[in-house]
Amino acid sequence: MSVVGLDVGSQSCYIAVARAGGIETIANEFSDRCTPSVISFGSKNRTIGVAAKNQQITHANNTVSSFKRFHGRAFNDPFIQKEKENLSYDLVPMKNGGVGIKVMYMDEEHFFSVEQITAMLLTKLKETAENNLKKPVTDCVISVPSFFTDAERRSVLDAAQIVGLNCLRLMNDMTAVALNYGIYKQDLPNAEEKPRVVVFVDMGHSSFQVSACAFNKGKLKVLGTAFDPFLGGKNFDEKLVEHFCAEFKTKYKLDAKSKIRALLRLHQECEKLKKLMSSNSTDLPLNIECFMNDKDVSGKMNRSQFEELCAELLQKIEVPLHSLMAQTQLKAEDVSAIEIVGGATRIPAVKERIAKFFGKDVSTTLNADEAVARGCALQCAILSPAFKVREFSVTDAVPFPISLVWNHDSEETEGVHEVFSRNHAAPFSKVLTFLRRGPFELEAFYSDPQGVPYPEAKIGRFVVQNVSAQKDGEKSRVKVKVRVNTHGIFTISTASMVEKVPTEEEDGSSLEADMECPNQRPTESSDVDKNIQQDNSEAGTQPQVQTDGQQTSQSPPSPELTSEESKTPDADKANEKKVDQPPEAKKPKIKVVNVELPVEANLVWQLGRDLLNMYIETEGKMIMQDKLEKERNDAKNAVEECVYEFRDKLCGPYEKFICEQEHEKFLRLLTETEDWLYEEGEDQAKQAYIDKLEELMKMGTPVKVRFQEAEERPKVLEELGQRLQHYAKIAADFRGKDEKYNHIDESEMKKVEKSVNEVMEWMNNVMNAQAKRSLDQDPVVRTHEIRAKVKELNNVCEPVVTQPKPKIESPKLERTPNGPNIDKKEDLEGKNNLGAEAPHQNGECHPNEKGSVNMDLD
């Protein structure tokens, strides 16, 4: 079973996997751990990752990047309309109102949703992980920004489902970083001690996130989070781009914004310049050749100028930090450490601002680029049964307060209740109780729309169906279980109605059966309490909310004893006495039955099942097309490689191994094949290249074999000659009565001599025949035949010549005057045997126990 953590960023992605030795960040086919979040579409296939980024400038209109923030948003979203102006590709509205991306693929115009584009990127990451692990990848944990709303999170889950990934958890970036930090720490305070508070700061390509976490041994709790979704390294790049656009317009009369390719080149160079200024404070040049209209441009900037240019952005850094400290009510002295991650935190001015705010130096003990992916892989290992990981519980926080609104049964007014406050523990479940006579609706929304970086405050509408009044006309008691799950998504998981069913007592046996019902059928309230205890154990608390109209309570309600449980012991004794008496009349008896109710969810920007299936089918077809195109290109490259290899060697090492007539014919075929490759064969089917390769190999293979045989034959013949000399010398020593071989039987040695003579005769004949042939003729014997003779010779001779000499027993000593005969050898052997038995007498056997793979986390 695979354990994979995926950090899917706006600019780049990282993949971490769990192995027996710990967590490892893996590299792609370019030996790079960083895979760009770029997808390029061509006339035959898709290109994803490094190869796509390399052609981003030349295929700007069909290369998609920076699409992560489009998840779960409508096309008319203000953020989408603003970002649309800065993109090299076109955005279009989809049929469901979402964001679509228009590209030319397979020479046709296609419209892909954001979920499909992300699924393509996940396909590449999945393929990279499978190539590294050498096994299929299904289970994974994917990172998302902590400020992602329900709609955005569901959109990411749909993308994972399209590519066939089972996302065990959508993990917040900062929570993943905290897990990667805390699980390796050996000096954390005990559970009963004051926790260690650490602040994590992450500035990536497009966003800025901070969180405060409390650590104890074996657990972490997120105290609070804050963020600026529109502040990242990209904004610093844009400041440089704006500066140099204005400079080039004045200096060279060139408008870089008028041509998308020129603007993309300037973006790339400004990003490089920003990274250089992080380590150099001197003036640094920026040079671009043939920028526009065949003109070269140049400029320069130093760190102080850059910081002055970005002063407005640097001031924004403190806003989320102030927000975090206010939410958590922490002081600077309460914070033990400040850990920074993310590529943009390498900017010296960013580090200085963070350090100045807290009044202490920042720490860089974590890998700034890979910390999120490693944390996701650790979480996946914790959730996977295939790995045994140190016990470590993770309690996340709800980033935005969530409320429910509903209509009263008999009034026009609405009831509102905040079920999850800001920074409430998650995952978490609560139960709300309603008194209703019919189906009713609940609408979930974010209580503070101004604090949510998303235009729609509504989460979804939930309809609790099949609710009916009791048979006596009273309102039914409906219990609704609301939950923020492991993905950070709000949902109404279950709803149940407490139904009172009257029964009649007919005889003593029926009464006795009814009296046993409490043991066989627990009441609904006790069942709910059990569920809540199980669900809330993840967060460590067990609150229960009972809501009736506008009345709310944070304490568990006392169950209404309307069934058999309301009987007192005295009443039970009275009933027992009445069993022996004839029944006076049939008495009604109330049973309490739990009825599960269906809940219909209408969520914001949720992909339908049919649309999702269509996307899955489309992705499968594109994967197959990419595979076929790769095989076709590999076949074409094999033909081209074959042409160059034989042409080069026919004028070199292969020249002696082909006759002049065949040489000219082969060279002519190579030239014709090369011309065909760059003309008619530029775009042919895979089979056409296979046929061409077979035609070339038909002429080239015999030449190649002659060369290889000529190279290897002398070495193999020399080995055979050495073995013959070795066995011939042993036979001669035997005939000379050498003591080393006098134990060998005469008949056995004759077999050796016969085999040596036969093989020697065969070798001489072969060498004489081969000497008469020229190099351009096929050899008389192949090297594999000579190796077979060596093996045959060894099989006959080696068992004979390596026979051990028989052991000679030492004579027994005569009786000595002081005692009986003593066989010293036997006595010695006895002592040795006695000593050898001692370990067996005292030793113990402990069989190895097979278990889960242990991960080395120390």
From Swiss-Prot:
The modification Phosphothreonine is found at residues 562, 816. Residues 500-585, 801-858 are annotated as: Disordered. GO terms for cellular component: cytoplasm; cytosol; extracellular region; nucleoplasm; nucleus; protein-containing complex. PROSITE patterns: HSP70_3. It holds the Pfam family HSP70. It comes from the Eukaryota. Interacts with HSPA8/HSC70. Interacts with HSPA1A (via NBD) and HSPA1B (via NBD). This is Heat shock protein 105 kDa. The lineage of its organism: Eukaryota, Metazoa, Chordata, Craniata, Vertebrata. The gene is Hsph1.
